[in-house]
């Protein structure tokens, strides 16, 4: 596994487009193919660093970059429907690598009246299921999502949902505090020097999304710039220091996880395994452990896995199922009417 980050310039443009700011159809057209090219470069870097020939690759699974996600029906031009929008042209990858590429997974679940998320629980069931323990899996990417695997569960017993913001709010606040010089609080070091502002935390925990019952999903369209602006405005009015503000929004993510477990799990998990970029934030991991004292809180690294690889592994598994025409959504998780084969194939 290798992690290849976007350049600051590309990241800023993705955030601009995904934030709903002024943009033309041409911007999205270009971005679709730019992402395809960047994914190719990342794949070539991986092959070069691992000594893998391009001709040895049999299949590529590519989720792409989400730009907008509307999981609940909205009325548009007289019609009511759900929708989701990811970019990163799979045909560009297919041309460069000369192998089948499976991409654009979420739309098929949404077409079946599902939420289109989370999709990782399919692979989590295969990898982490236990005969004797209730295992909770908390992914902390931009958005947090949690999966519950009851002891000896079947696939149809699995349930999962988005817990709320993962790193998204923390990163946006830290970017504001540093004037854009830094985009995330590495290791949670800055937050570790602050104290939680209880009044602000209480206000954040009144967030209506938290009390919505699963299945549910959310994204930048909810926890994006407008949400963060309210936090920053409040912090300025109340003269909350930067470190206290970071400590508060970090604990907020931890408390959304606690709330989700306490309100929506059928039983207390024996252990909770944290994955995604948030697992690298020691302050956040400690906050989760403090919030769930009766649960063993681990990271994927504690089990010998790479947290950053979790979603890459998940979409490789999903792509393999697609090629063999295997249903790869989990209707009990997404709320879809029926099992479907997700992913579009570029040959």
Describe each model-derived feature in a short phrase.
Residues 269-289:
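Glycine-rich phosphate-binding loops at beta-strand->alpha-helix junctions
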Residues 1-26, 158:
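Short glycine-rich, Thr/Ser-proximal phosphate-binding strand/loop in the N-terminal lobe
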Residues 77-84, 91, 95, 99-182, ...:
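Phosphate-binding/catalytic loop of phosphoryl-transfer enzymes
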Residues 3-6, 153-254, 258, 325, ...:
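Conserved ATP-utilizing enzyme core subdomain
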Residues 22-87:
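Short beta-strand-loop/turn "lid" adjacent to the catalytic site in phosphate-handling enzymes
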Residues 38-46, 242-268:
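Phosphate/ATP-binding catalytic cores across multiple sugar-kinase/actin-like superfamilies
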Residues 289-314:
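Conserved phosphate-binding/catalytic loops in two-lobed NTP-binding clefts
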């Amino acid at each position: 596994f290798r992690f290849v980050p976007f350049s600051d310039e590309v990241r800023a443009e993705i955030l601009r487009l995904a934030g709903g700011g002024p943009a033309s159809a041409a911007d999205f057209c270009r971005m679709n193919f730019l992402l395809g090219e960047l994914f190719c470069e990342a794949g070539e870097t991986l092959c070069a660093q691992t000594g893998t020939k391009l001709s040895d690759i049999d299949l590529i699974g590519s989720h792409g970059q989400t730009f907008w996600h509307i999981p609940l029906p909205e009325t548009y031009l007289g019609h009511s429907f759900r929708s989701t929008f990811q970019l990163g042209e799979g045909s560009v990858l297919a041309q460069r690598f000369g192998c089948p590429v499976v991409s654009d997974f979420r739309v098929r679940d949404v077409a079946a009246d599902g939420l289109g998320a989370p999709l990782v629980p399919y692979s989590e069931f295969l990898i982490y299921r236990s005969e004797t323990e209730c295992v909770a899996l908390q992914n902390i990417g931009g958005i947090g999502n949690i999966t519950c695997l009851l002891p000896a569960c079947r696939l149809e017993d699995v349930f999962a949902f988005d817990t709320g913001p993962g790193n998204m709010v923390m990163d946006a606040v830290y970017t504001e505090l540093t004037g854009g010089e830094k985009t995330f609080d590495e290791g949670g070091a800055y937050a570790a020097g602050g104290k939680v502002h209880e009044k602000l935390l209480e206000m954040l925990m009144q967030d209506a999304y938290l009390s919505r019952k699963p299945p549910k999903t959310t994204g930048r369209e909810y926890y994006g710039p407008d949400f963060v602006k309210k936090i920053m405005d409040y912090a300025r009015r109340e003269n909350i220091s930067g470190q206290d503000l970071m400590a508060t929004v970090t604990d907020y993510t931890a408390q959304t996880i606690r709330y989700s477990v306490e309100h929506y799990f059928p039983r207390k998990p024996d252990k909770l395994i944290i994955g995604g970029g948030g697992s690298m934030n020691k302050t956040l991991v400690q906050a989760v452990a403090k919030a769930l004292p009766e649960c063993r809180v681990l990271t994927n690294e504690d089990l010998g896995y790479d947290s950053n690889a979790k979603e890459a592994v998940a979409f490789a598994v999903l792509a393999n199922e697609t090629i063999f025409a295997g249903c790869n959504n989990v209707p009990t998780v997404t709320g879809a009417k029926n099992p479907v084969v997700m992913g579009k194939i570029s040959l």
